[in-house]
Amino acid sequence: MTKLRIKVVKKGNAYDLYGQDLPLQFKENRMTPECDQFELGQEFEVDNLDCPPGFCSWALADIQRDMSHIFFRGNYPWVAQKGATLVCCTDGFRPVFFKIERIED
């Protein structure tokens, strides 16, 4: 049975992306500098394309296309490791980067 492992490999923040000259200011008292939904190194395993428990539904919407591609035995020709890819959520202030790997029994 095919499964996917989704691992948090990087958490960004607005200052990493843009330096001190942010193109749009945010209210620091309303938002953490980095995403607080995930921890670096956190892993999720799924045997379908449903949202794993504890996974951000917004991030899932962003990476679901790549999850489907890898889950259904797709590969990307520019990625050396078959059955894997790197993706990120589209939060322009605090993106989270994920490694998706296919696990086959």
Task: Give the positions of each predicted feature.
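Disulfide-bonded cysteines in secreted/extracellular proteins and peptides
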Residues: 35, 56, 88-89
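Short, basic/aromatic beta-hairpin or loop at an interaction surface
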Residues: 4-25
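Ser/Thr- (and often Asn-) enriched beta-sheet segments in non-cytosolic proteins
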Residues: 3-7, 43-45, 97-104
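Generic structural motif
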Residues: 9-13, 49-51, 103-105
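Short, compact, well-ordered microdomains
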Residues: 60-105
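Short, flexible N-terminal segments of the mature chain
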Residues: 20-50
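Short, Lys/Arg- and Gly-enriched loop/turn segments at beta-strand edges
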Residues: 51-62
